[in-house]
């Protein structure tokens, strides 16, 4: 590493990578007053959407709402650049409702670049970081043992420039030694058309951080002018008035477009079966694990062999481009077969392929090497966020970027990190899963991963997290005032509904009974009326039982709070009970290998992950309830021994 006399520049924080994690991290640290540099291989591809040009979906939309509630960027940009919006799972309960936006990918990137360029304390740099500079110091630990401490000092670029930093956040996405595959042909690339990040993986190994290999993929893009749309089902934009962001100033002025639906055919399936041996996975060219919840079309045909057809979505990539993203049709087959495959789909019989599908292999850092703050256990002040931690998706990346950015600044300020619990957020659920589970495939957030999904809805993310965002310093005064006003209106409306009664003799009551079939016996409150499954806030408006024109978000929040009041109270009680048990801390210096009352698997996994508390320990694979009980007993015995030792020392000193 170069001498510090040749330092080009010095920063408080350096962020490596300009994807969705890197942008959130850099904006966060800069907004909190720390000089920040964002390094990326290509400044023209910042916050690019190399796979589907969309934000949101089940659980992912909840993540976006949470990032926005804390003061992040992804929700605002998704709202401003959306060219189609839909509510998914609308026929089911509010725990799984999900907003999904089709975005204009070029507009999204353009707006993010503008934000970065106009953020105080933030510099953009085009360079490939190949080396991390680490300072090593010896410290005296427990039992007077010497401990080697490692701390980040700076970074070095491919061409030899050195930049010093007090903290570094790695957000390299799929670029670490990335290699893209089409059939049995491959080339070094982070994604199509962009070079891979070389050298940093080897450096990570040298400084004590392990990496492994994962795979993902993206489908072909076809020219919309070559599609026969009359043969397809139309999927219009149906939720243009719904927003990810809680900021009342965010608006969408983009034209709205439709997506279209086609399906695979028997000819599609046969062509895939005949050519499986030519794909990177089935041909044995690579063996990295791909995402379970976003499989290639060949995986679908093999794993669901009895299924006659699979739905395929045709999604526009923007307003001013002819490119259509063929969602659900990613593949690693050779290019000529890809075109043949596409032309077996209804509506695509004469399609022109603009970009082929490809698979991409890349290095990632297993997140069991991270603390809950996303700081690495091995090196102080070094953080890691996004797809490099084994996740998949822009939303997961953005959430991690914000967390890493917040905690990097808190570390520099000598403050405790902000820890997101499973009970508080999907952010907490995701991070807890990442750092406690030995994942071998790309991780995607799902509503089924959360035990508290009725509490962790998208509509109440601001109620759960905006006070924290304000406390951190990411929510400005204007936004905070808007939040407080919303909370007041929400509580006032719930109070009004609880204290306004209807008598069965009232004319409006007779009308409600006649039209809804809901009998009103004696009298009832508007709250009790709203609790009924076939009565909604829109009915209050219909029967002129609303006092003022409240925004749709307040109407929705009031109705959910009232309709699910019993369930929400029960879940709150469960959370409080779990918190009392799970918050008991576990000292980091414990050597679990020496606790003979634990199972061998529990000893190994506990030593590897080093959980901070019993809650984290309970979620580690291989750690049973019996192991947790044994650990609790061991800790009590340890505490008793310490107390006895202290008493003995005190007696000796006083004698």
From Swiss-Prot:
**Primary location class:** cytoplasm
Q: Do you know which Pfam families this protein is assigned to? A: GIDA (PF01134), GIDA_C_1st (PF21680), SAM_GIDA_C (PF13932)
Xref: HAMAP family: MnmG_GidA
This protein's GO CC annotations: cytoplasm
What does the UniProt function comment say about this protein?
Answer: NAD-binding protein involved in the addition of a carboxymethylaminomethyl (cmnm) group at the wobble position (U34) of certain tRNAs, forming tRNA-cmnm(5)s(2)U34.
Record organism: Prochlorococcus marinus (strain AS9601)
Where would you find this protein in the cell?
Answer: Cytoplasm
Q: Which SUPFAM superfamilies match?
A: FAD/NAD(P)-binding domain
Q: Which UniProt keywords apply?
A: Cytoplasm, FAD, Flavoprotein, NAD, tRNA processing
Give residues annotated as binding NAD(+).
Answer: 290-304
Family per UniProt? Belongs to the MnmG family.
Question: Which GO biological-process labels does this protein carry?
Answer: tRNA methylation; tRNA wobble uridine modification
Cofactors named for this entry = FAD
Residues given in the record as FAD binding sites: 17-22
Instruction: Give the molecular function GO annotations.
Output: flavin adenine dinucleotide binding
**Subunit comment for this entry?**
Homodimer. Heterotetramer of two MnmE and two MnmG subunits.
Q: What is this protein called?
A: tRNA uridine 5-carboxymethylaminomethyl modification enzyme MnmG
Task: Supply the source organism's classification.
Answer: Bacteria, Bacillati, Cyanobacteriota, Cyanophyceae, Synechococcales
């Amino acid at each position: 590493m170069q001498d510090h006399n040749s330092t080009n520049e010095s920063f408080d924080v350096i962020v490596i990578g300009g994807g969705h994690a890197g942008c959130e991290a850099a904006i966060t640290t800069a907004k909190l007053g720390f000089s920040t540099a964002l390094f990326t291989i290509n400044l023209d591809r910042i916050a690019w959407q190399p796979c589907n040009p969309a934000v949101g979906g089940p659980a992912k939309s909840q993540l976006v709402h949470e990032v926005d509630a804390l003061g992040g960027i992804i929700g605002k940009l998704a709202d401003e650049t959306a060219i189609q919006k839909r509510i998914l799972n609308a026929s089911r309960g509010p725990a799984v409702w999900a907003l999904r936006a089709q975005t204009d990918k070029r507009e999204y990137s353009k707006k993010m670049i503008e934000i970065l360029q106009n953020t105080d304390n933030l510099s953009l740099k085009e360079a490939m970081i190949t080396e991390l500079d680490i300072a090593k110091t010896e410290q005296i630990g427990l039992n007077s043992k010497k401990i080697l401490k490692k701390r980040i000092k700076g970074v070095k670029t491919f061409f030899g420039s050195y930049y010093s930093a007090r903290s570094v956040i790695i957000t390299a996405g799929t670029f670490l030694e990335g290699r893209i595959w089409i059939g049995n042909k491959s080339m070094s690339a982070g994604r199509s058309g962009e070079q891979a990040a070389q050298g940093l993986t080897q450096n990570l190994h040298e400084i004590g951080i392990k990496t492994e290999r994962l795979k993902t993929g993206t489908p072909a893009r076809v020219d919309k002018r070559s599609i026969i749309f009359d043969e397809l089902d139309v999927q219009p934009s149906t939720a243009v008035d719904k927003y990810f962001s809680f900021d009342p100033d965010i608006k969408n002025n983009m034209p709205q477009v439709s997506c279209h639906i086609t399906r695979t055919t028997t000819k599609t399936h046969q062509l895939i079966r005949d050519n499986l041996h030519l794909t990177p996975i089935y041909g044995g060219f690579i063996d990295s694990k791909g995402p379970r919840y976003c499989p290639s079309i060949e995986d679908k045909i093999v794993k669901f062999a009895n299924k006659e057809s699979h739905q395929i979505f045709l999604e526009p990539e923007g307003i001013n481009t002819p490119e259509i993203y063929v969602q659900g049709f990613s593949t690693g087959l050779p290019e000529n077969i890809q075109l043949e495959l596409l032309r077996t789909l209804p509506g695509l019989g004469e399609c022109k392929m603009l970009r082929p599908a490809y698979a991409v292999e890349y290095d990632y850092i297993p997140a069991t090497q991270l603390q809950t703050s996303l700081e690495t256990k091995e090196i102080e002040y070094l953080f890691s966020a996004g797809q490099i931690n084994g996740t998949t998706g822009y939303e997961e990346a953005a959430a991690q970027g914000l967390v890493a950015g917040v905690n990097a600044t808190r570390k520099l300020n000598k403050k405790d990190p902000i820890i997101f619990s499973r009970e508080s957020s999907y952010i907490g659920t995701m991070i807890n899963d990442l750092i406690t589970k030995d994942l071998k495939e790309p991780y995607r957030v799902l509503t089924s991963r959360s035990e508290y999904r009725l509490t962790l809805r998208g509509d109440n993310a601001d109620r759960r997290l905006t006070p924290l965002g304000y406390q951190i310093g990411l929510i400005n005064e204007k936004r905070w005032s808007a939040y407080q006003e919303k909370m007041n209106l929400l509580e006032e409306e719930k109070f009004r509904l609880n204290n306004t009664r209807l008598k069965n003799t009232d004319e409006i009551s007779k009308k409600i009974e006649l039209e809804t079939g809901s009998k009103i016996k004696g009298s009832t409150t508007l709250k009790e009326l709203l609790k009924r499954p076939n009565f909604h806030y829109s009915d209050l408006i219909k029967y002129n039982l609303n006092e003022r024109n409240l925004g749709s978000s307040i109407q929705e929040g009031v109705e959910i709070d009232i309709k699910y009041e019993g369930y929400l109270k029960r879940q709150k009680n469960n959370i409080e009970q779990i918190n009392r048990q799970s918050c008991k801390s576990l000292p980091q210096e414990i050597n679990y290998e020496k606790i003979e009352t634990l199972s061998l698997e529990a000893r190994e996994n506990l030593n590897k992950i080093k959980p901070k508390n019993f809650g984290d320990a309970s979620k580690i694979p291989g750690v049973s309830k019996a192991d947790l009980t044994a650990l609790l007993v061991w800790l009590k015995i340890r505490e008793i021994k310490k107390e006895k030792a202290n008493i003995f020392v005190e007696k000796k000193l006083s004698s």
